[in-house]
């Protein structure tokens, strides 16, 4: 292993946590996405309810 390579085993958890996030995009959950998500959960709950309550 050359001098420039970094062994992943010697990187501590505090170094990983303290690194700044390079992706600064804002996570958005608007009303349409919320409705689609709730509809998906509801449809999946109806479909799998026969297996759960059998």
Swiss-Prot record:
Pfam families noted in UniProt: PsbL
GO biological process, one term: photosynthesis
Record keywords: Chloroplast, Membrane, Photosynthesis, Photosystem II, Plastid, Reaction center, Thylakoid, Transmembrane, Transmembrane helix
Annotated GO CC locations: chloroplast thylakoid membrane; photosystem II reaction center
Keyword Plastid carried by entry: yes
Cell location: Plastid, Chloroplast thylakoid membrane
Signal sequence annotation: none
SUPFAM superfamilies cross-referenced by the UniProt entry: Photosystem II reaction center protein L, PsbL
InterPro entries referenced in this protein's UniProt entry, alphabetically: PSII_PsbL, PSII_PsbL_sf
Residues annotated as transmembrane: 33-53
Membrane topology qualifier: Single-pass membrane protein
Described function: One of the components of the core complex of photosystem II (PSII). PSII is a light-driven water:plastoquinone oxidoreductase that uses light energy to abstract electrons from H(2)O, generating O(2) and a proton gradient subsequently used for ATP formation. It consists of a core antenna complex that captures photons, and an electron transfer chain that converts photonic excitation into a charge separation. This subunit is found at the monomer-monomer interface and is required for correct PSII assembly and/or dimerization.
Family: Belongs to the PsbL family.
Identification of the protein by name: Photosystem II reaction center protein L
């Amino acid at each position: 292993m050359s001098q420039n390579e970094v062994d992943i085993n010697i990187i501590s958890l505090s170094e990983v946590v303290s690194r700044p996030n390079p992706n600064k995009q804002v996570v958005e959950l608007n009303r349409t996405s919320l409705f689609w998500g709730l509809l998906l959960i509801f449809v999946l709950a109806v479909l799998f309810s026969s297996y759960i309550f059998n």
